[in-house]
């Protein structure tokens, strides 16, 4: 996986407000107006966090009238899961070879 893309994905999880947004989106698609009501943050702050989440691929948005609607992207989540899963795969090392040669 591209390291830049991986960094964007995990940056999305590194803020309390973004984690709160993701928890709200677990229940399905939500309008930005609903997110604003539930989070008690300003519209510019929400836009900032949604840009990071959308740029990461974890969240996708669609415009309906004057409002944006957001949902969790199953594709983006799958990429994050595969990366994390890859970190836990046991590495094999040649035990006969010293580690610092």
Predicted segments — roles?
Residues 45-49, 87-89:
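Short alpha-helical linear motifs
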């Amino acid at each position: 996986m591209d390291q830049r893309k991986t960094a964007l994905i995990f940056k999305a999880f590194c803020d309390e407000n973004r984690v709160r947004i993701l928890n709200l989106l677990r229940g399905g698609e939500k309008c930005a107006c609903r997110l604003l009501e539930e989070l008690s943050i300003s519209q510019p702050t929400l836009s900032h966090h949604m840009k990071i989440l959308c740029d990461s691929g974890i969240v996708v948005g669609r415009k309906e009238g004057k409002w944006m609607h957001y949902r969790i992207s199953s594709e983006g989540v799958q990429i994050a899961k595969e990366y994390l899963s890859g970190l836990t795969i046991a590495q094999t090392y040649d035990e006969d070879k010293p580690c610092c040669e």
